[in-house]
């Protein structure tokens, strides 16, 4: 496998839809869970060292919209406060997919490792899904802990 060229995060900005999420703790991504996240857009602002996230999460079938601002750290890692502290990195990027790896430490101090596959729409290329499964395994998450989020997303576009 050839190493991925360093992506310019600015070029990755735009509309992104959550396709799949993997988690070391399935309760974090299940029904009514905080990380069953329906992403809508990500804007990377290198000048200000910020990232802007817009997404929905559902509780009791009700979609709630979130707009969060994260701060860029060393090594293209971003810190975002949401259901605890999160450190995420873009593990892989193509024109049609983003794969994000996230470490969440919740209010109780419990650590959860998550991966997300985001697409420009609801169709995901086979090679992007395979790459996502590979990144998920590399993060120590078993394949049975991957959830199809597209099928659950009925929040506003």
Curated annotation (Swiss-Prot):
Keywords: Disulfide bond, Olfaction, Pyrrolidone carboxylic acid, Secreted, Sensory transduction, Transport. This protein is found in nasal epithelium and it binds a wide variety of chemical odorants. CDD domains: lipocalin_OBP-like. One of its GO terms (biological process) is sensory perception of smell. It holds the Pfam family Lipocalin. GO terms for cellular component: extracellular space. Disulfide bonds join 63-155. Monomer. It comes from the Eukaryota. It comes from Sus scrofa. GO terms for molecular function: odorant binding; small molecule binding. Belongs to the calycin superfamily. Lipocalin family. This is Odorant-binding protein. It is found in: Secreted. InterPro entries: Calycin (IPR012674), Lipocalin (IPR002345), Lipocln_cytosolic_FA-bd_dom (IPR000566), OBP-like (IPR002448). The modification Pyrrolidone carboxylic acid is found at residue 1.
């Amino acid at each position: 496998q050839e190493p991925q060229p360093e992506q310019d995060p600015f070029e990755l900005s735009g509309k992104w839809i959550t396709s799949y999420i993997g988690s070391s703790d399935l309760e974090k991504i299940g029904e009514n869970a905080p990380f069953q996240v329906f992403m809508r857009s990500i804007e990377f602002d290198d000048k200000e060292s910020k990232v802007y996230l817009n997404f929905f999460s559902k509780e009791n079938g009700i979609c709630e919209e979130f707009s969060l601002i994260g701060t860029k750290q060393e090594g293209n890692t971003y810190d975002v406060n949401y259901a605890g502290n999160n450190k995420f990195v873009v593990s892989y990027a193509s024109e049609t997919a983003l794969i994000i790896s996230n470490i969440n430490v919740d209010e109780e101090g419990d650590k959860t490792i998550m991966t997300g596959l985001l697409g420009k729409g609801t169709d995901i290329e086979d090679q992007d899904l395979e790459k996502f499964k590979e990144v998920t395994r590399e993060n120590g998450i078993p394949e049975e802990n991957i959830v199809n989020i597209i099928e659950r997303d009925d929040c506003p576009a």
